[in-house]
Amino acid sequence: MRLPKVIRITATAFFLFVIGVLGQSRGAPGTDAAAGKDVFAKRCSGCHSTDSNKEGPRLRGIVGRKAGSVPGFPYSDGLRNYGIIWNEELLVKWLENTQAVVKDNDMEFRVSNADERSAVVAYLKSLTN
C-alpha cells in the first residue's frame, strides 16, 4: 500500500512540475526586447543607429522624445512640425505604415509583422534612459 502512495505523490509532483514549466509566461508575443534587438539589426540598422545619426536619426531615447527633435538631423517638415511625443503605441503604428502617421515624411518603410513591430518598440523602449 505504501508504494502506490509514493508513486501517486511522485507522479503528481512530476505532473505539476511539467505543467509549471510548460505554462511559464514568456510575455506577450513580440514584446521581447532581445527579439527586438535582432529585428532592429536585420530591418532597421541599415538606416538607423541607436547612438548616432545615419540616413535616419539616432533612436536611443525615442520613447518619450518629441518627434523630429534630434539635433542636427534634417527631418522632413511634416515630421519636424508633427508636435507629438513618441510613445509605444504611436511607434507601433509608425512601423506599420509611416505615411499613414505623417504624410510626406522621408521614411517609406513598413514592418508588416505585428510581433516584429512590437518587439522593435520593446527594444527601443529598453534603450530609454
What kind of region is each of these model predictions?
Residues 40-50, 120:
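The canonical Cys-X-X-Cys-His
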Residues 87-129:
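C-terminal capping alpha-helices of c-type cytochrome domains
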